[in-house]
Amino acid sequence: MKNIRNFSIIAHIDHGKSTLSDRIIQICGGLSDREMEAQVLDSMDLERERGITIKAQSVTLDFKASDGETYQLNFIDTPGHVDFSYEVSRSLAACEGALLVVDAGQGVEAQTLANCYTAMEMDLEVVPVLNKIDLPAADPERVAEEIEDIVGIDATDAVRCSAKTGVGVTDVLERLVRDIPPPQGDPDGPLQALIIDSWFDNYLGVVSLVRIKNGTMRKGDKIKVMSTRQTYNADRLGIFTPKQVDRTELKCGEVGWLVCAIKDILGAPVGDTLTSARNPAEKALPGFKKVKPQVYAGLFPVSSDDYESFRDALGKLSLNDASLFYEPESSSALGFGFRCGFLGLLHMEIIQERLEREYDLDLITTAPTVVYEVETTAKETIYVDSPSKLPPLNNIYELREPIAECHMLLPQAYLGNVITLCIEKRGVQTNMVYHGNQVALTYEIPMAEVVLDFFDRLKSTSRGYASLDYNFKRFQASDMVRVDVLINNERVDALALITHRDNSQSRGRELVEKMKDLIPRQQFDIAIQAAIGTHIIARSTVKQLRKNVLAKCYGGDISRKKKLLQKQKEGKKRMKQIGNVELPQEAFLAILHVGKDNK
């Protein structure tokens, strides 16, 4: 056991985590050169296309160190994006140490800090690594000072390497073996294994990634899931070298995969503890804290026949992604679907794309909203995650919106622009600290503004230099109203949005104008209105298409023309009473862009 090292790689987006993982795999001979490819751990097509890591992946490698010993390295490559920080915290729970990778050109960024603090809270040994020293812009001295100033860990002798060229990667491994402690645990005690992650395989059922904390797990053992008290047979187990390799046992301190023919997707939830059925452990390991979704949106299949397969797909996906929340929802405009909760807009986009690709579905998404806390006049507190669930205005005593605490790190040159943006987003400054030429800003901004397009706008006002980390702080009373959209005097529930009263006029007008462009013209006039309660705040009309009924008249008497026009008018009137308007998919997506800059 003293030769096992479990560690994660944490860093800001694009600081080179996945490339460093590639080099480590190559040096330790996990894959032959023929099988090696760039970003070997980003196994999803989506991850490769966007160049980001979404799912944490684990690998077991053997490394022969300079002291002649062979060490077993279990390492987990983690995502860097703010929306996937729960993946990082889950990976860290399985480790004793973390490699903090910092780009020697960019320096410390917000996510570097957030992930590093998560690791320190879990009492992990953090080893700083300066990556990308082959770049002409690299300044390792300055960045080492920055790490000490901002993060507060000693970086004077931080390892310098270039994952791209492979320089210094062996030093990283030597340092890691030296500084990261071996796992603690009792190899002879009762089995306790923590489920770090699980996914669904069509042939094997549920595959779980486990970290053995105490005891040993052998092939063929009877295994009990502590939360559900169900017992299963350990059919196959093994490690990833990135390929799946079968083993006969997993020893204390190791990380590996397990298949025990669980067909029910809720059979082995992430964060649960596995123990042996013969000699069970007394208590479960502390799991992970449940992450609360920040953004909710309705997802509906385009054709209602897909509802069943959509439900199965969501079930399989939620197994792999513990933070995805969903419940059935029906809408008069869109039929049956699900209300889903996500951690942020990127997470929402990724989930929608994975559903469409991996499960071949066509989906419509409604506008994302955050959760509001509503105190009714009957003094009840309810949580509303969809505009259609908001009680009528006269039943609301107080409406509170979620406030996010945003930590931003940016160069001084862009401070003015970023402050202007934060004020425009109804933000309140709580802290500002200068570190050299970097500024650390803390603002409290309403969550609804953050999830809409704050990240994109922050990047564009600071030319991509600012970085952001945010978390939920509290609920705060606010003057929010629901803007409804009426089409021919009928409310369309899927188009409603909740917004601040100050912005409601402009948002309503903008939405109505957008709808006017998107709804195709019909044989009758279509009135599109935005309303708060019964008060109409904006209106526009999609003009009817009409045939020229006078074309056949060639001159002739005016009363003859009047008769024809009158007849057409009555026909249109009758049509309007029975006609209904088909809304195109773009109309629902239009709300996503309301309130965004049309630059």
From Swiss-Prot:
GO MF annotations, alphabetized: GTP binding; GTPase activity; guanosine tetraphosphate binding; ribosome binding; translation elongation factor activity
Domain (tr-type G): residue spans on this chain: 2-184
Catalysed reaction, written as an equation: GTP + H2O = GDP + phosphate + H(+)
Annotated residues for binding of GTP: 14-19, 131-134
Subcellular location(s) per record: Cell inner membrane
GO terms, biological process: positive regulation of translation
EC number: 3.6.5.n1
Keyword terms: Cell inner membrane, Cell membrane, GTP-binding, Hydrolase, Membrane, Nucleotide-binding, Protein biosynthesis
Topology versus the membrane: Peripheral membrane protein
InterPro entries per UniProt: EF-4, EFG_III/V, EFG_V-like, EFTu-like_2, G_TR_CS, LepA_C_sf, LepA_CTD, LepA_IV
GO cellular component, one term: plasma membrane
CDD domains: EF4_II, EF4_III, LepA, lepA_C
Pfam hit, one: GTP_EFTU_D2
Function: Required for accurate and efficient protein synthesis under certain stress conditions. May act as a fidelity factor of the translation reaction, by catalyzing a one-codon backward translocation of tRNAs on improperly translocated ribosomes. Back-translocation proceeds from a post-translocation (POST) complex to a pre-translocation (PRE) complex, thus giving elongation factor G a second chance to translocate the tRNAs correctly. Binds to ribosomes in a GTP-dependent manner.
Family to which the UniProt record says this protein belongs: Belongs to the TRAFAC class translation factor GTPase superfamily. Classic translation factor GTPase family. LepA subfamily.
Protein name, as recorded: Elongation factor 4
Name of the encoding gene: lepA
